[in-house]
Amino acid sequence: MIVVKIGGRVVKNSLDKVILDIANINDKVILVHGGGDIVTDYTKRLGIEPVFVTSPEGIRSRYTTKEELEVYIMAMSLINKMITSKLCSLGKNAIGITGADGGLLLAERKKRIIVIDERGKKRIIEGGYTGKVKEVRSEVINHLMKLFDIIVVSPLALDVEESTPLNIDGDQAAFAISKAVKVNVLVILSDVEGVLVEGKVVDRLTPEEAKELSKKIGPGMNRKLLMAAESVENGVNKVIIGSGVKDRPVSSALELNGTVIVNG
């Protein structure tokens, strides 16, 4: 079993390549998708101005109000069903769900977050409807995998305490699921060839090397490296960070094109 995570830019620019490639893979697949650019498009169409915040670490992320959460759910559900229907039309036995369905991903809403304001100062604001995954109900995945070959998962989670779905980071969802079911391989696809140092792709990293390198590279990729290291240390065989915009993107990554994080 493998997990594949595709980022929002891959969803927008290279989705058909990914779907066709996954349809030709002879393995069980959990596909976790993003779609931030599409969420932004729909938000603006509905007359809602999207808000983004920057953390002290320099990571820019969507600030999800209750109103925008509704748009987020709508857009992610659309992406999910588009992917699932295309896979089914290619003869694959696929199902599309969100992380909130069946309580697959249980999360806690961030009550407050620290952001950098327009003056460059730290400020504490209400957390909105963004969450952090606290638990993965792996039995949901295990049961569905007895019935389906491919599970397409939207990055939503369930806040049991407040009985509401939450926007969660797609990478976080993919890493959490991978650790919980201890998959053979987690493939992270974005619009770059892998982890770049001085313009060149780093071919291979141990978890320890990944953690060390995370201190020296930019926001976004540094989080991927930290989560990759933790995943490998917790039972995932290997994590591969590669390009989602080339031909056969998943197969190419499985052929170890990109950055491979693995023990030893």
UniProtKB/Swiss-Prot annotation:
Q: Which GO terms describe its biological process?
A: arginine biosynthetic process via ornithine; L-arginine biosynthetic process; lysine biosynthetic process via aminoadipic acid
Q: What is the enzyme's main class? A: transferase
Name the positions where substrate binds.
G35, G36, R62, N167
Q: Where is this site: Transition state stabilizer?
A: K5, K224
Q: Which InterPro entries does the entry mention?
A: AceGlu_kinase-like_sf, AcgluKinase_fam, Asp/Glu/Uridylate_kinase, LysZ
- CDD domains xref list: AAK_NAGK-UC
Pathway given in the UniProt record? Amino-acid biosynthesis; L-lysine biosynthesis via AAA pathway; L-lysine from L-alpha-aminoadipate (Thermus route): step 2/5; Amino-acid biosynthesis; L-arginine biosynthesis
Gene Ontology MF term list: acetylglutamate kinase activity; ATP binding; N2-acetyl-L-aminoadipate kinase activity
Cellular component aspect of the GO annotation: cytoplasm
As for what it does, the entry says: Involved in both the arginine and lysine biosynthetic pathways. Phosphorylates the LysW-bound precursors glutamate (for arginine biosynthesis), respectively alpha-aminoadipate (for lysine biosynthesis).
HAMAP family (alphabetical): LysZ
Q: Which NCBIfam families match?
A: argB, PRK14058.1-4
Similarity comment text for this entry: Belongs to the acetylglutamate kinase family. LysZ subfamily.
User: What is the protein named?
Assistant: [LysW]-aminoadipate/[LysW]-glutamate kinase
User: What organism is listed for this UniProt entry?
Assistant: Saccharolobus islandicus (strain Y.N.15.51 / Yellowstone #2)
